[in-house]
A protein has these predicted regions:
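Bacterial N-terminal signal peptides that target proteins for export
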Residues: 1-6
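N-terminal signal peptide c-region/cleavage motif recognized by signal peptidases
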Residues: 14-16
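The canonical Cys-X-X-Cys-His
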Residues: 200-212
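Extracytoplasmic c-type cytochrome modules immediately beyond a signal peptide or single-pass transmembrane anchor
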Residues: 19-199, 213-231
Length: 231
């Protein structure tokens, strides 16, 4: 039912897909995007031991169960229940994110059910969700997850690829080179940028080590970037 409601709401919002917003609203939207992506990706992160050990159950990884897990994580982090009926850009982003999340976990049911080491890792999941999300929110909001070239497990997630054509690509690359863990939310020309560094969790360090990448827990692990056109 939620998926049907989300699809209907997105269709109704399509007429405003290219409307620009104020800087203040864009900053709020950037924060919301950070919350959505962090908590959504965390759902798959929580399941990594079960996925890697081929110990998931069909009920545990069904699309509905995973969406419910996302809603629970969101509520715990935000302090408020997830409301997909919210108005404005925040509501549009929530609906697009849930639709993208649901679409991806539905497409990859085989991986989630069969499992195995690295069968469905959080970074891959996040990349697929953002790809779908960006298509739904074209002209309104774009979201990216990327890292420094020397620390990429997958070259497809390099800045020059995921942010191709973005006015923020050069600035993001420069910020990442500093390795700073401080977020940056600012206006750059006609765009508000939400730049949010990601810290490496123990599971990430362990997984990356298997690919020959030596990293430190709590260190810089790439960045999530929100790009929002403004008036």
């Amino acid at each position: 039912m939620l998926r049907i409601a989300v699809a209907a709401a997105l269709a109704a919002a399509a007429v405003s897909a290219h409307a620009q917003m104020t800087e203040e609203v864009a900053r709020q939207a950037a924060q919301e995007l950070r919350m959505l992506v962090t908590e959504g990706t965390g759902v798959i992160g929580d399941l990594q031991p079960a996925i890697n050990g081929s110990k998931t159950t069909k009920e545990q990884v069904s699309p509905d169960a995973l969406v419910n897990a996302f809603r629970a994580r969101y509520q715990k982090a935000a302090g408020n229940a997830f409301d997909p009926k919210a108005t404005g850009i925040v509501g549009d982003a929530r609906r697009a994110y849930v639709q993208s999340f649901t679409s991806v976990v539905t497409r990859y049911q085989g991986n989630l059910n069969k499992g195995g080491q690295d069968a469905f890792v959080p970074a891959f999941f996040r990349a697929q969700v953002l790809k779908d999300f960006n298509q739904l929110m074209s002209g309104k909001v774009q979201a990216y997850a990327t890292n420094r070239d020397a620390e990429l497990i997958n070259g497809d997630w390099a800045v020059h690829k995921v942010m191709k054509g973005s006015p923020l690509a050069g600035e993001v690359k420069t910020l990442m080179e500093t390795g700073s863990l401080e977020p940056v939310v600012k206006r750059s020309g006609n765009t508000v940028m939400g730049y949010y560094p990601m810290k490496l969790a123990p599971a990430c360090v362990s997984c990356h080590a298997q690919n020959g990448l030596k990293q430190t827990e709590g260190g810089f692990g790439g960045a999530f970037v929100a790009e929002i056109p403004v008036k």
